[in-house]
Regions:
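Metal-dependent de-N-acetylase/amidase catalytic core
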Residues: 1-10, 27, 31, 52, ...
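ATP-dependent adenylation/pyrophosphate-handling site
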Residues: 5-14, 18-55
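Short, conserved clusters of charged catalytic residues that mark active-site
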Residues: 19-20, 60, 94
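Residue-level marker of intrinsically disordered, low-complexity segments enriched
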Residues: 38, 69-70
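Short glycine-rich catalytic loops that host catalytic nucleophiles or stabilize transition states
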Residues: 40, 79-83
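Generic hydrophobic, amphipathic alpha-helix propensity
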Residues: 61-65
Length: 229
């Protein structure tokens, strides 16, 4: 049987893919997997700036995402450009249908997306849309749904113990961490100064913490939401 080597990353904002699974994507692309990325929100329009500045920054963010795709070895991403931090104002069915359309087109076996209890409302709704769009009916291509963490969102939420991010899948990114950092730097407007968690030092600290948890130098951690064998 021919192995399905298509992977889909569904992220709320351009930069979430780097923070959540940038090293893992670099590993997978090196192994010959075809990685497609779907960005749901523009990641910018919630800011208190003029429309002209917002439009310019959206274009800059798109260009950065395309640059990142080349660094990590992914396909050129697709942008839905729904309003930033306002996905709760978009009919969920609209987002679901866009994800279903992408799945029909590329037939991925694996999907990476957000953890369902993140603080950010867009992250939560993207997770909900993905889970709905991937109902495991007969002959459905998606066999794995893997949830990633995003600095300054996953760890900032207030949640019950059962909704805490408890990873059960770790990926060694010691050899791909340099690419993760290069990709993060491409989103220069999103990288903050230490001690913000979304700083370069914060990114490395999390990778070291996740790595030491499983006896590795650097790692990314995930929750496997669904695995069908």
């Amino acid at each position: 049987m021919k192995k399905n080597k298509n992977i889909l990353v569904v992220a709320a904002h351009p930069d979430d893919e780097v923070l959540g699974c940038g090293g893992t994507l670099a590993n997978l692309s090196k192994k010959g997997f075809n990685i497609y990325t779907l960005f749901v929100s523009d990641g910018v329009s919630a800011r208190n700036e003029t429309k002209d500045i917002i439009r310019r920054k959206i274009e800059q963010r798109k260009l950065a995402a395309i640059k990142v795709s080349k660094i990590l070895g992914c396909k050129i991403p697709e942008f839905l450009l729904y309003p930033d931090n306002r996905l709760d104002q978009v009919p969920l069915l609209n987002i679901i249908k866009k994800i279903e359309k992408k799945i029909r087109k590329i037939k991925p076996e694996t999907i990476f997306t957000h953890f369902d209890s993140d603080l950010n409302i867009d992250h939560k709704l993207v997770n909900k849309a993905v889970i709905t769009a991937t109902r495991p009916v007969k002959n459905f291509p998606v066999k794995k749904i893997i949830l990633f963490e995003v600095l300054s969102s996953t760890e900032w939420r207030f949640s019950k113990k059962e909704n805490f991010f408890q990873p059960n899948f770790f990926v060694d990114i010691d050899k791909s961490f340099r690419k993760k950092v290069l990709a993060a730097k491409a989103y220069k407007s999103e990288i903050k100064a230490w001690p913000h968690p979304r700083s370069l030092q914060g990114i490395k600290n999390l990778a070291k913490f996740r790595g030491q948890t499983v006896g590795k130098n650097l790692a990314e951690a995930f929750v496997i939401a669904r695995l069908i064998k």
